[in-house]
A protein has these predicted regions:
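ATP-binding pocket architecture of kinase catalytic cores
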Residues: 42-140
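Conserved NTP-binding catalytic cores of kinases and kinase-like/nucleotidyltransferase enzymes
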Residues: 1-85, 210-212, 329-334
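ATP/Mg2+ or Mg2+-diphosphate-binding catalytic cores
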Residues: 149, 161-164, 284-334
């Protein structure tokens, strides 16, 4: 584990062959379920440092780095990966630093997206279209995280376990068990003949707006085999679906038109097109519940997981919204 002191900034600089300038500093930026992001200020240079809470492997990281380098060379804005000691992109922290793994990237200056901003709906559609047009063939099978879901009994079991620990989200989980099962019924295996390498998490939190107005895509750790149809469906839900079960129809149309104009091949065929979005939501929910209920997990991780569970349960999409977006996409794309 690293912190914002000079010792940690020196450790990071050493791991990646950077000069530890006087005054070098690590500034916390954000955290997610899988890791924490820091900004490293080293003299005139700035870098993004990702501290991973869970183990990764060098081979998959190298595949990701090669893919993002391909996209960057074609004009996609993203934080390129930088290697460290021994040419390795993944640097392991010593047991004395409580373990963990580090990645280093070029820093990108930008601001979070404003979902109501003029031109954003078209901009994200164009970006997604270009990403899919530039995508490389899938390098292997789909990870089950993206097209399988927990068994129907899982949600009641987790709710019971949460009640036993007095967890604040227990009743919300129990009350949503029926909806979770209905959503799970829409998840099917991805067709192998339409797989390409996708980002697989095109959430607004993973996109920045640069000073030029260009969009930059962050967090490529999960890039891998997926169907463009399903990534497009998830994008519509992430960017234009509302918690009250409605959608911004005009924005959806602008995104879809720009997606197709940008070369995107995706087509929402039916409600099952939302399968990847739903599988990720449900698997994330189960994974966070496992962390929150684990007495051996770090208190910081348990608290974060509990917060994510409550947020995810509150934002589950209504089946009617999925049907509406499917019909709207069919009418727009033909």
């Amino acid at each position: 584990m690293i912190c914002d002191g000079s010792e940690s900034s020196g450790l990071v600089c050493g791991a990646f062959g950077l000069t530890a300038e006087p005054g070098a500093a690590l500034i916390p930026v954000s955290r997610g379920a899988m890791g924490r992001v820091w900004r490293l200020d080293a003299g005139a240079e700035r870098y993004a440092v990702k501290e991973l809470f869970w183990e990764s492997d060098e081979e998959s990281v190298r595949t990701e780095a090669a893919f993002t380098a391909h996209l960057e060379s074609a004009g996609i804005r993203l934080p390129g990966s930088l290697p460290g000691r021994g040419g390795r992109f993944l640097q392991e922290l010593a047991p004395g630093q409580d373990g963990g793994w580090l990645r280093l990237y070029r820093w990108i200056d930008g601001v979070p997206v404003d979902l109501a901003g003029p031109g954003l709906a078209a901009a994200i559609g164009d970006l997604a279209g270009r990403l899919h047009a530039l995508a490389r063939p899938a390098g292997g099978p789909v990870d089950p995280w993206y097209d399988t879901v927990p068994a129907p009994a899982t949600w009641d079991q987790l709710a019971d376990a949460a009640r036993g620990q007095g967890a604040g989200w227990a009743e919300a989980m129990a009350g949503r068990a029926g909806l979770l099962c209905d959503l799970a019924d829409l998840v099917t295996r991805m067709p192998g003949d339409r797989l390409v390498t996708c980002h697989r998490d095109l959430h607004p939190d993973n996109v920045l707006v640069e000073a030029s107005g260009e969009l930059a895509v962050l967090d490529w750790d999960d890039a891998g085999p997926a169907c463009p149809d399903r990534e497009l469906a998830g994008l519509l839900m992430f960017w234009h679906g509302h918690d009250d079960g409605t959608a911004d129809d005009a924005a959806v149309r602008r995104t879809l038109a720009a997606y197709r104009a940008g070369g995107g091949p995706g087509q929402l065929r039916d409600e099952q097109s939302f399968g990847m979005y739903l599988a990720c939501r449900l698997n994330f929910l189960e994974a966070q519940a496992s962390v929150a209920l684990d007495p051996g997990a770090a208190p910081e991780h348990r608290a974060y997981a509990s917060s994510e569970i409550s947020d995810t349960l509150a934002r589950l999409p209504a089946p009617s919204l999925i049907s509406h977006l499917t019909s709207l996409a069919a009418a727009t794309l033909g």
